[in-house]
Each structure stands twice: as C-alpha cells, then as structure tokens.
C-alpha cells in the first residue's frame, strides 16, 4: 500500500507487472510436477503483490521459463493448457489476469513465438483470467500485420505493449506508430497501452525516456488511447 500510495501521490498509476520470474532459477512451464508447483507458488505471490499495487495486468513473457525443447506441438499443449488454467484460477482469486506474451525466437523463445500461436493457447486454455498480450515489437520482428492481428484477436487481448525490436526506445525501431494507433482505435478503443523498453547505453536514461514519452504522447495520448510509461 505504501508503494502504491507513493506513486499515486506523484500522479502515476501502477497498471501492470512483467519480468515475473526475474531472479528465479530452474522454473519452467514444461518442468516436472515439483517444478510446476514451485513456479505456480511464485506466480501466486506475484499476483498477490500485483493486486495490492492495483496492477491487475500480469504479463507472462519469460521465454526461458517456457522452454518446450524435446516436445512435439501436441505434447507441449497437453502440458501448457492445464498449467495455464491453474494459473488462471490463481490470478482470478486475486482479481488479476495473466497476459501471455508472444516472444519471437530471437528473444530466446520456442513456445508462443507469434500472435497466432499465443492466441491458440489462450483459446485452448479458455479461462477468463488468461488473456493475450499484444506486443508491437514482436509483431514487427515476426513480420505480422498489426491491423490483421487486432482484427483477429482483439477479443483475446488483455494488454498492449508499445515496444520496438530489441526493446529500443519507442520510435527508434522503425515501427509505424500512426498505423498502430489507427488499428488500436478501430479494434481496441479505450485500451490502455504501455511503453516497454530497456535502458540505453549511449545516452542518459532520462533523455531516452523523454524521447519515448514524446513518441507515445504524439501518437497515442487521446480520449481513445492513453500511453503510460
């Protein structure tokens, strides 16, 4: 509550969480039963903390923690579906929801690497607390069309990340944000969107953050779509 209040006093609302498994070791959706139990226990704590912060959107990226090496597509789904249903139950208890994020292979992923694959998992899990994440950087890397993806999967999407390939500052990766904005306005009006980027090495962080915010405000800040860092 203190953390939430501190940010609120400064006009910032905490709306989502990611890097859910940062600092952990050996956790994998496709691990043994004991590994799965440990992973779910950790994610239960994340959901509890998220609920306390008002962060209801819990973004599950973590490509190395969904390593399906050695499994066929069918075998992977046979394991993933019950796991995510259990995770959905946990998230719902805390009033949060999980957003499964497509991570392309260049980010180290081999499961849910595209929007279509991720949407298929969400559809098969069929749980109200398991949603899909739309990530503009992943769309760009995969050569996916944002308008087509939104038209097909808008009803599955729970959160949107505005990102560039390799998590460059927003505006530095060649994404047509006017096109993204138009698609969001058409298919997900009123959807909150969030900047996702990593720290820059060749300029002060405050400079890159300010540049990214200017891009977000220019393209996304309006009555229909509001960008938050």
Residue ranges, per PLM feature:
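Conserved, mostly hydrophobic/aromatic
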Residues: 7, 17, 50, 80, ...
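Short, flexible/disordered intra-domain loops and linkers
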Residues: 1, 108, 203-207
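Short active-site-adjacent helix-start/loop capping segments
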Residues: 15, 23-28, 203
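Active-site-proximal loop/turn and secondary-structure-junction residues that shape catalytic pockets
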Residues: 20-23, 64-66, 102-106, 136-138, ...
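Histidine-acidic metal/acid-base catalytic patches
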Residues: 40, 54-56, 115-134, 138-229
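Active-site acidic/histidine proton-transfer and metal-coordination neighborhood
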Residues: 9, 26-131, 141, 223
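Short, well-structured secondary-structure segments
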Residues: 13-17, 58-59
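Aromatic-lined substrate-binding rim segments of carbohydrate-active enzymes
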Residues: 1-11
């Amino acid at each position: 509550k203190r953390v939430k209040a501190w940010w609120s006093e400064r006009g910032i609302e905490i709306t989502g969480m990611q890097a859910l498994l940062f600092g952990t070791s050996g956790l994998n959706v496709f691990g043994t039963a004991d590994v799965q139990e440990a992973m779910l226990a950790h994610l239960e704590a994340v959901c509890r903390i998220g609920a306390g912060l008002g962060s209801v959107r819990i973004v599950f990226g973590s490509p190395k923690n969904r390593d399906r090496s050695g499994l066929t597509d069918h075998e992977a789904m046979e394991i993933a579906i019950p796991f995510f249903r259990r995770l959905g139950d946990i998230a719902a208890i805390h009033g949060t929801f999980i957003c499964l994020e497509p991570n392309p292979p260049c980010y180290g992923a081999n499961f849910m690497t595209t929007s279509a694959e991720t949407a298929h998992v969400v559809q098969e899990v069929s749980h109200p607390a398991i949603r899909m994440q739309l990530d503009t950087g992943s769309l760009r890397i995969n050569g996916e069309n944002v308008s087509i993806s939104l038209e097909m999967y808008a009803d599955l999407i729970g959160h949107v990340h505005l990102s560039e390939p390799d998590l460059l500052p927003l505006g530095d990766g060649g994404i047509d944000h006017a096109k993204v904005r138009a698609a969001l306005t058409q298919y997900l009006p009123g959807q909150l969107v969030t900047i996702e980027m990593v720290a820059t090495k060749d300029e002060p962080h405050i400079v890159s953050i300010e540049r990214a915010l200017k891009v977000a405000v220019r393209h996304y800040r309006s009555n229909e779509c509001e960008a938050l860092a």
